[in-house]
C-alpha cells in the first residue's frame, strides 16, 4: 500500500518529521517497505505536441516536435493517438521508467534520433480499468506544460498483514500513529444537510451482507482537482472523473470501498444475489467474464447485471463525464464470499482485496456521507434519503480484561492510566469501574481482536517492544524419558539400525489384519484413505517402509522408530511410547569373506536384550514366554516378561503377514513398551576379579518339550547362586532317538569361587546340586547317550 506524506497529514495533526514517522511505523508493527523521496520522478513532465510528421522509413512511427516548457525536442512515437495540440507525459532523457527500471536515452529509431519518450499508462504503471486501449496518455488542457506529472511528495510504501484490514486506509494508519503519541487524529467531516426525499431506487440483499445506497440527481460530473489526481496516481490509479475518483479516494483513505452507478441505467431496484451458472458479464475493463454461483451480482428488475459485488462494476451502468444522475453504493459482504467470487473470475481489484480482509460494517453510512458531501461540493446536485437492507447482524465484541496481565505477560512497568489511554486512542470502549477487571468493547473495524491476549498485544506494541524487560530463561529439568530416548537411539544406531519417523496414523485394513481393533481409533477426517487410523503399533508403518524400500531395490533393511502408540491394550495414555525395530534381508552386505547371512529371530532378540540392559534390566532377570500374537511366527517368537510384566516381544513375522505386505523375504521384528518399563535402581559396585581359578562344566539335560529353556537356566543358576557365575546354552537337540516329546539342552556352567580354589569333591558336590535341582523341579535327567 502506498500513500504520500501530505495525504497522511490530512488525518494526522502532527509536526514530527518523516523519518520519525517511518521509525514509529516499524515500531508499532506496520512494516515500511520503501520511502520514495520522488527525486527521479521530476524528469516526467507535461509536454505539448507541436508537430506530427510521418517517419520516412517506418509507416507506424511518427516524428514529433514536443515542448517541455523549456525547449522543443524531437521525439519518435509509435502511438496511434498522437496528434498536434495534445498534452501528454514526456519521459526526458535520463528518466528511470517505473515499471521495468529502464533508463531513457537518446536513441536512433530507423535513422531518426529521439530525445525522450511519450508515455502510456502501462509504461508508467498506472491502472486504468476503463481504458484498455493502447496509446499514449492524453491529458486535459488544464495541465500546464513543463509541470511535473507525478506529485513530488514523499511516498511511503507499507506492507499490511492480512489481519489489519483497517490499515488498508490511510486513516487507519493515522489512528495507530496518533495512539502511539505522534500527534492527534483529526475528526472526519459530516454531511450537514440531510434529505427528506425518498430514493427512486431500492436495494434488496439475498446474501450475507449489508447494502446502503443513495440516489443523487442533477450532478455536473467534472474533472478531478490536481490534489485528488495526484493521490490516486501514487497508488497507480488513473483519474476517470471526479465522481469515480471520489469513490477510489474514500476507499484508499478509509478502507471503505464504494461503487457508483449511472442511475438512469437501473430499473427501480438493485438486488444483490448469487449469479446463475454460465452468466455472461461485461465489466468496466472491457472484458467479458463467465459467472457462476460463487459470484454475488447486483441486478435490477429486468435482471440486468450492474456489478459483481465487491469486485468490479458493469460497463452497462458505468459513470461517465456526461452522467447526471447517480446511485452510490456502500456495502459489506462476508470476506469468504468475495474470495470465492474473485477467484471464480480470476480478477483481483483494490476493492476485492479490501473486502477479503474485512471492512468495517459500521462505517457504511459514514463512507456514503463523506462521498456525498464531496460530490455535492464539486459537482452540485440533489441528494436523496439513504436506502438500506441488512441480512448480516453486526454484534459488539466485549471482552473481560485484566490490566495487570499487560505487566505480567509483557514484563513491563506500565500504569493502568497509560493502558487506558492507549485503548481509548485505538477506539476501544473501556469500562474501568473495577480497578482489576475491565470490560472492553472492541471497535468494529478491528476484526482481529478476539481474546484478551490480543488487547495485551495492542498495548505492548504501542508502549514499545523495546521497553520489555529482559529476563533470563528459566532452566527446566530435562524429562528423563527424553534422556532414555537419546540413549536408545544411540544404542540402536550402533547396532546397525537406522532411525525413521513415520505418521501417527496408519491403514485400518492392515491394522485389523494384524489383530488390532479399530473401534476407538478411527479418524473422522483423515488426510488420506490409507491413513485413517491412529496407530496401535509402530510395526504397521515400519513394514510399509520395508515394502517401499524393497521396491526401490534395497536388499538389506534395518530400521527402528521411537514414538507413541494409541489404544494399545486400552491402557495407553499420553506417555505410551514404544521402540520398534524391523530387520530384513542379510545381516551384512555382500562381501569378500562371505560372512553375511539372513537375519533371524536371534538378531532381534539381541536387540531387545540390549535395550533392556540400557534401561537397567539385566538379561538374567527377564523371562521369555511363548507369544500368542497372530502376526508372529508360532515358534520363532517370544514375549519378554519382567516380574510378570510384559515389556515387549520379538520374533519372525508370520508368512501370511509378509505376503500381505508383498515383502519378498522373511522379516524379523521387535517392539519394547517403554511406558511399561519399571524404574530399576542399579547398585553400582566395584568390579573385582577373583584370584582363584574358575571351573567350567558341561551338562546335557533331557527335559519335556513344553518346558522353557529359560526356566532350566534359572533352576540351574539358583541351585548354587554364590558359586555359579554364568550359565549359557550351547546346544539343542530333538529327535526320535531321545523321544517324541523330549528336548536335549546342553548347558555350560561356570563356577567362580571367591575365597579358595575348588577341589574335585567340591566340584562334584556343586554338579550334583544342579542335577538334583533339575530333576526335582523340572523332571529333567542328565543325558547319558
Curated annotation (Swiss-Prot):
Family assignment from sequence similarity: Belongs to the phenylalanyl-tRNA synthetase beta subunit family. Type 1 subfamily.
Domain FDX-ACB: 690-783
NCBIfam families registered for this protein in UniProt: pheT_bact (TIGR00472), YtpR (NF045760)
One GO MF term: magnesium ion binding
Cellular component annotations (GO), alphabetically ordered: phenylalanine-tRNA ligase complex
Gene3D superfamilies: 3.30.56.10, Bira Bifunctional Protein, Domain 2 (3.30.930.10), Ferrodoxin-fold anticodon-binding domain (3.30.70.380), Nucleic acid-binding proteins (2.40.50.140), Phenylalanyl-trna Synthetase, Chain B, domain 3 (3.50.40.10)
Keyword RNA-binding: yes
Single Gene Ontology BP annotation: phenylalanyl-tRNA aminoacylation
Subunit structure of this chain's protein: Tetramer of two alpha and two beta subunits.
Organism: Ehrlichia canis (strain Jake)
Full protein name: Phenylalanine--tRNA ligase beta subunit
Location(s) in or outside the cell: Cytoplasm
Database matches in HAMAP family: Phe_tRNA_synth_beta1 (MF_00283)
Main location: cytoplasm
Textual note on the cofactor: Binds 2 magnesium ions per tetramer.
Enzyme Commission numbers on file: 6.1.1.20
SMART domains found in the cross-reference section: B3_4 (SM00873), B5 (SM00874), FDX-ACB (SM00896)
Annotated binding of Mg(2+), by residue: 448, 454, 457-458
Pfam families in UniProt: B3_4, B5, FDX-ACB, tRNA_bind, tRNA_synthFbeta
Top-level EC class as recorded in UniProt: ligase
Covalent S-S links between cysteines: none
Ranges where the tRNA-binding domain occurs: 38-150
The keyword Metal-binding is assigned to this record: yes
Needed cofactors: Mg(2+)
